[in-house]
């Protein structure tokens, strides 16, 4: 699931520190990195964009869809429901986790064979990956989206539903300037942001 790479639409918290142009450049690199990991994993991949515009044509390799729903939970649920019409299982990832790897995706795919739910927790209280074999609206009820309780709320729901759950290693997303500084070893971060700013 991703937003199209449009200036002013993506990484707004990061843009407050580095500017819209740098934030867009970093986001595009994150998007392309995420896509590359998905391709190398060998897992069939579709992209659900928050909206469609001419920029998504740059990613012709993937089947593209539009996200539908009033909040993030509904958009995730609807995307799962659509994919699981033709698949036995589905992994859903965002596009801002710089440490996402082929191994992580393949580990999640394998774990889902013997579980109901796979979650990759992020250190901000959310998750960078969720995997399901069945789309259940109850899993996404009463979740305070975009807060530090998303992971906890989801786990509470999973326990209540009796879902066998596997947790992947915790990773982090790039949402703001402090997150970006943690990933300065990545080429796109060093090239996209003024070195003086990175030293703050």
Language-model-detected regions and their locations in the chain:
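Conserved donor-nucleotide/metal-binding helix-loop-beta segment in metal-dependent transferases, i.e.
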Residues: 100-125
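Conserved alpha/beta core of the MobA/IspD/sugar-nucleotide pyrophosphorylase nucleotidyltransferase superfamily
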Residues: 153-200
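N-terminal nucleotide-binding beta1-loop-alpha1 segment
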Residues: 1-13
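Short, glycine-/small-residue-rich phosphate/pyrophosphate-handling segment
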Residues: 136-157
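Acidic donor-binding segment of Leloir-type glycosyltransferases
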Residues: 42-63
């Amino acid at each position: 699931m991703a937003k199209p790479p449009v200036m002013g639409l993506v990484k707004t918290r990061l843009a407050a520190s580095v500017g819209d142009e740098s934030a867009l450049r970093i986001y595009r690199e994150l998007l392309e990195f995420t896509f590359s990991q998905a391709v190398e994993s060998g897992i069939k991949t579709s992209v659900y964009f928050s909206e469609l515009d001419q920029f998504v044509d740059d990613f012709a390799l993937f089947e593209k869809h539009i996200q539908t729903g009033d909040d993030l939970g509904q958009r995730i649920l609807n995307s799962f429901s659509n994919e699981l019409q033709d698949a036995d299982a589905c992994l859903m990832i965002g596009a801002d986790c710089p440490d996402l790897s082929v191994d992580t995706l393949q580990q999640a795919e394998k774990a889902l064979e013997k579980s109901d739910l796979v979650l990759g927790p992020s250190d901000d209280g959310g998750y960078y990956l969720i995997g399901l074999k069945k789309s259940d609206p109850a899993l996404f009820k009463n979740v305070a989206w975009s807060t530090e309780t998303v992971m906890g709320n989801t786990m509470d729901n999973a326990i209540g539903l009796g879902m066998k759950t596997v947790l992947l290693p915790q990773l982090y997303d790039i949402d703001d300037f402090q997150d970006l500084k943690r990933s300065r070893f990545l080429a796109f971060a060093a090239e996209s942001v003024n070195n003086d700013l990175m030293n703050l």
